[in-house]
Amino acid sequence: MRENNQSSTLEFILLGVTGQQEQEDFFYILFLFIYPITLIGNLLIVLAICSDVHLHNPMYFLLANLSLVDIFFSSVTIPKMLANHLSGSKSISFGGCLTQMYFMIDLGNTDSYTLAAMAYDRAVAISRPLHYTTIMSPRSCIWLIAGSWVIGNANALPHTLLTASLSFCGNQEVANFYCDITPLLKLSCSDIHFHVKMMYLGVGIFSVPLLCIIVSYIRVFSTVFQVPSTKGVLKAFSTCGSHLTVVSLYYGTVMGMYFRPLTNYSLKDAVITVMCTAVTPMLNPFIYSLRNRDMKAALQKLFNKRISS
């Protein structure tokens, strides 16, 4: 009963990105700049794909889902950080902290599995072009997206429930600008050995899509290099280049965050999370649209339609 009362009244203090006021002011301005660009950029991708019938195919269906996930992903943390900075308060309730952690794990996993589905789509398109429409049918695409969301939720729920069962004594300062599982485990005065094992299991589940992406691209490049045509190789690189760039950015920052011992985590590592939670979702629309003629044409049509109306 006492633990329930503690959970209902407990508040955490979010130390921010650096914990230094002057630097926090800089990151506030940075986030104030990044967040609207992230929302507008990803929303434009979704609207362009929905409005252009030429983009109603598996590749762009998956891209639209990725853009939606990126909108939700950045919205879980940045608005709270901006609101806290404006109000001068750094506090977040226990329930709010768990909610934030749940959606970060959920959407992070969904993002990861969506990237794997996109790699699989490219592998099928290049290595089995004659069977592409059969394999990547609308039903298959829906199953891939639904599976991504289900796995994301299934991975997030156990971690959230386990964290909710922990006791927190004394220090309640979270070494980040949002509630993440790693700093919360470090704050707990409960036995966290099982929780740490579950966290690394979760990281393993999160890493499965990376293995799928690697296998997919091995298939892509083994197919491409069998074709004695420089043009074919260049076309494959142009088709897959944007996706590979996003995968490298995303997994590079995630590995910097989680592929390390729990004892090594400190406030300095919060800077890495800025790349994952804010910068990468902002860059994705630019990466996919600037290198894609069809997407640029669809965006141009969308702008022309809005201007003429």
From Swiss-Prot:
Residues 50-57, 121-139, 219-235, 291-309 are cytoplasmic. Keywords: Cell membrane, Disulfide bond, G-protein coupled receptor, Glycoprotein, Membrane, Olfaction, Receptor, Sensory transduction, Transducer, Transmembrane, Transmembrane helix. Pfam families: 7tm_4. One of its GO terms (molecular function) is G protein-coupled receptor activity. It is found in: Cell membrane. SUPFAM superfamilies: Family A G protein-coupled receptor-like. Disulfide bonds join C97-C189. GO terms for biological process: detection of chemical stimulus involved in sensory perception of smell. This is Olfactory receptor 1A1. It is a multi-pass membrane protein. InterPro entries: GPCR_Rhodpsn, GPCR_Rhodpsn_7TM, Olfact_rcpt. Belongs to the G-protein coupled receptor 1 family. Residues 1-25, 80-100, 159-195, 259-270 are extracellular. Gene3D superfamilies: Rhodopsin 7-helix transmembrane proteins. The keyword Zinc does not apply. Odorant receptor. Its main location: membrane. Glycans are attached at N5, N264.
